[in-house]
């Protein structure tokens, strides 16, 4: 497909532009019936067009959501980390089904003193619809879920994740577990969230947590190499390790 080009674009190298707007992603899939093969914009194009046209994270969110509304969203459910030198946001988005242009989405700002993560599973549950400074969402994010039969409660109880990407045990053990290991490494609350990862409770982990100390670039790089070492999920000590240790 084709879209109209902007009058001005910005330099982009990798996943960052000249204003230090940075966008990362993980795919969570979500309800398969919401995929739309007729949309023009896939998540990768959405990232790079957003970077070409935005000077702040907030501006990137508006540009990205306007694009899918105008041209349609081709990909499955997606989690985006959208950052600039002053703010970090987590945005989650999923289509509306075959032939329906647009998407439902929500974006939540991560507090300056907190850390967050996503690992191929939708992580935004309840969000404050009245906090316009720290939360943005599509106007029909709740009403569309009601229309499809995914949710029938009151607005304050609405969970984007449960409505559009219901968890199963595999999602917890293979996706949410990676977020748990990150939180476990840098907070004292890891033991509180482990029962959720093990499927013993349905209380999800928070979207963000306050770490014990400010993280360095090296801290983040190290966690990208994490294999649950020294935790109950250590893969060298379970059946997945096979005969190797």
Please provide the spans of the model-predicted regions:
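A contiguous strand-loop segment
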Residues: 1-42, 63-203, 207-210
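Long, well-ordered mid-to-C-terminal structural blocks that present hydrophobic/aromatic surfaces
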Residues: 198-245
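Second-shell loop/turn segments in exported
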Residues: 33-37, 45-54
